[in-house]
Amino acid sequence: MDSPMEKFIQTYLTLLRDGDETVETSKLSESCRKEKLDMKQVNEWIALFDVDKDQKITFEEFCRGLGLKQNEMRIERNHIKTVQSGREQSLPEGVSIIASTMPKPKQVEVTQLFKDIYNEVKKDPDMNKVVKTFKSELERRYGRVWQVNAVTHSYWASFSHEPFQSIQFQYDNKIILAWRTPSN
């Protein structure tokens, strides 16, 4: 489930214009209202970005204001566009998503990565090796710092993560929890 911050970021990225990479504050407020976000919080966030009071928020201002990496937000924006266009791929066979804040294209990438590692190492019953390899590969592909857990029964979890960097899924008889925490 997306947090209010993730919904806000997704709303901004959806409205972002290609040419000049700006969003008008009025359009952002209107879209956030439609998404039923807390407008008091939205207005506080907008005030972080529009410091020059020109009623526009550039992509650079937005990322700087929230401490987000521009290159990662461009990737997230491309994922959003893929979903909106209907060109997204299906999840790998045998994978079911329990919860995720990742856009569907990234869910496909991450679950396929796990499935490949799991099936490669499956002959070795040491799940620790699978988890360590999966964590290392997530960090190589998506940056540091990832946390990975594998469980076989019920679980309860509460954790903080970077926007759009959390996934919980089941494959075979394993439940995998993975999320990225800030590295700074």
Swiss-Prot record:
Ca(2+) binds at D50, D52, D54, K56, E61. PROSITE patterns: EF_HAND_1, EF_HAND_2. Keywords: Calcium, Metal-binding. Pfam families: Dynein_light, EF-hand_7. Residues 37-72 form the EF-hand domain. Disulfide bonds: none annotated. One of its GO terms (molecular function) is calcium ion binding. One of its GO terms (cellular component) is dynein complex. GO terms for biological process: microtubule-based process. This is Antigen Sm21.7. It comes from Schistosoma mansoni (Blood fluke).
